[in-house]
Amino acid sequence: MPYSVTTGLVGNQQLALFGLPDTTSRQQPGLIVEAVDNYWGGGEFIYCRANGSIRQNGLVVITPTTASGAWRYDCTEVPNTANLGRMLGVATTVATSGQFIWVQISGITPVNCQASVAADTTFGIAAAGQGGANSAGKQVLNARIIAAGATTVAKASCTGNSGTNRLVIPNADGWFCGVYLSGTGIAAATTVTDIDPSGTVVTLSANMTAAVNGTVTATYNNATVYYNVAHLNRPFAQGAIT
């Protein structure tokens, strides 16, 4: 299910680990809301304008900048640089420059990473827009991995027709856009590209090769991209260490 905003905001852009970015600002960038999801729990999200291409669940830097005589909050993929000392967040969707998205700054979320990181450990910036193993000067502070990128979440009683890309599932708990799927009738390298607001229908990146009537498994990595699950509390990149 999508996150439900709990702070009284009316008419908000869909706030979820799935859905689409928007080319029109629906709120003032910089707005922070609290929201809750039945599976991922509560969290905080800041409304930002993408100032470059951002990958799914990418690690981003949040930067206030002036535009048209007012302050605006922009986000870009975090550079692979030590001692940044900058505010970070996790993008809830893929975006390109000029689009508006929600960025998670507290709560539990998958983070796009270069490698699997063990649960209950710190992590750091490993590449532009990606987390990974911690290293000197690159730690993501106020954040910790709570589930490794080797996590799998299987759903029984899934159904879908051969040649289509719409899969009906019992619920979307533990699934998110970008997660890798496998099972009878699921094409190789298939990912989830969208999840219906009901949480019971997902759109796949490839058509099913045969009718699906059974278990489909989501894996949090494809041996190249790893979605480690992190607990965030307004994270920031490590600053000077000398």
Put a short name on every predicted segment.
Residues M1-P2, I54, V60, V90, ...:
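Generic hydrophobic secondary-structure signal
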Residues N83-L84, A95, T151-H231, I241:
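Small/polar beta-strand repeat architecture
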Residues P2-V153, T219-T242:
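Glycine-anchored, exposed beta-strand/edge motif detector
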